Design a protein with these regions (language model features):
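Active-site gating loops and adjacent loop-to-helix segments of metal-dependent hydrolytic enzymes
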Residues: 26, 35-77, 204-222, 261-283
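Aromatic-lined glycan-binding groove of carbohydrate-active enzymes
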Residues: 232-281
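Active-site gating/metal-coordination segments in enzymes
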Residues: 93-234
Length: 354
């Protein structure tokens, strides 16, 4: 086996012109999908996180690269000056920072989950407070402790900590985000005007996803796709019309094949549920990021949902991230200057209130 390697640079999925720092849209540029880690929280849960059963299906090269990424990118998560430098290189004026997905810690016990969520949130808020002109925060909530506990921490995030909302993983153990036990959380999120960003952390059914990093490459957008389906078909979006919901990585696979859910809704009673309108009616309320890597995918996303529902993201600082986010938008030739300004920052500015 050759020496395992991964790169944190311009995507191989498209050609590149001038980088984003040289080609500027009219708006402030906002990266609404970026991460950090809180070391104190990691120390608190050390020894309390169950072994990940998916790892048994991963080849040795994938295991090595996962460990390597954790080591290589740690300072990019935690070093403020380094983050500012990378943002400058990418032409990003502002970041909305959320915890790295593993720091949602849904697999620890409910009691520990409540404690560690608060610690993560305190850490993210303190980090962002050091540069409030360039950073804003999303937190996490202890979903495994139930909807009421999650709603309580959400209120603390939005109030005391001054966050803009929270990040949720795409499922909570064997429960979907649409589980009735979480309804009180969705009620609170809508009432507070909180932004809720759903983010995958690898696909649960890993047996067929082990090789070629497919657990992330295919699994991450697939898990987002499943989460969106449940949130729509179980009526969460119908019951909460003012909910501010983001689906990262361009919303997974659902936007590209959304006609199928409308067809099923019209064709079969078991796909109809209690929805009064076609499923894509609710999908059109969702916001998406630009992490789709190619101009034609971005064009399709904007064509379907409009520049007022698509926002620039990077997934900083991971290897599956977008390291020329402004260039991606500006280089998508079909987009008008007005659309470019909205996607690069205007839509996020309005949604997050920054």
């Amino acid at each position: 086996m050759a020496e395992p390697s991964n790169r944190y640079t311009l995507t191989a999925a498209r050609a590149h012109g001038k980088p984003g720092r040289e080609v500027r849209p009219a708006s402030t540029t906002i990266d609404m999908h970026a991460h950090m880690v809180v070391d104190e929280a990691a120390a608190l849960v050390a020894g309390h996180i169950p072994a990940d059963p998916r790892v048994q299906f991963f080849p040795e090269e994938t295991r090595i690269l996962t460990r390597k990424q954790d080591e290589d990118r740690h300072r990019y998560h935690t070093d403020l000056d380094l983050r500012m430098s990378v943002m400058d290189e990418m032409g990003v004026d502002m970041q909305i920072i959320s915890p790295a997905p593993p720091q949602c810690y849904y697999t620890v016990t409910p009691d520990l989950g409540v404690k560690v969520a608060a610690m993560v949130n305190d850490g993210v808020a303190a980090f962002c407070a050091r540069r409030p002109d360039r950073l804003a925060a999303l937190g996490t909530v202890p979903m495994q402790a139930g909807g009421a506990a999650a709603a309580e921490e959400l209120a603390r995030c939005m109030g005391k900590l001054g966050m803009k909302g929270v990040e949720l993983l795409t499922h909570v153990g064997e429960k979907e985000l649409s589980d009735p036990g979480f309804e009180v959380f969705w009620d609170k999120a809508e009432a507070l005007g909180a932004v809720v960003m759903i983010h995958p952390n690898g696909f649960t059914e890993a047996r067929r996803f082990g090789r070629f990093y497919f657990n992330n490459v295919i699994g991450n957008p697939f898990d987002t796709t499943m989460a969106l389906h449940y949130l729509i078909f179980d009526g969460v979006l119908a019951r909460h019309p003012k909910l501010k919901l983001i689906a990262v990585h361009g919303g997974g696979y659902l936007p590209a094949y959304s006609g199928r859910i409308d067809h099923a809704w019209g064709a079969r009673s078991d796909s109809h549920g209690e929805l009064k309108e076609a499923p894509t009616t609710y999908l059109k309320r969702v916001y998406f990021d630009t992490i789709v890597f190619t101009p034609h995918q971005l064009e399709a996303l904007v064509s379907l949902f409009g520049p007022d529902h698509v926002m620039m993201g990077t997934d900083y600082p991971f290897d599956m991230g977008e390291y020329d986010p402004v260039g991606h938008i500006v280089g998508t030739k079909s987009l008008s200057p007005t659309a470019i300004s909205a996607i690069a920052g205007g839509t996020a500015k309005a949604l997050f209130g920054v």
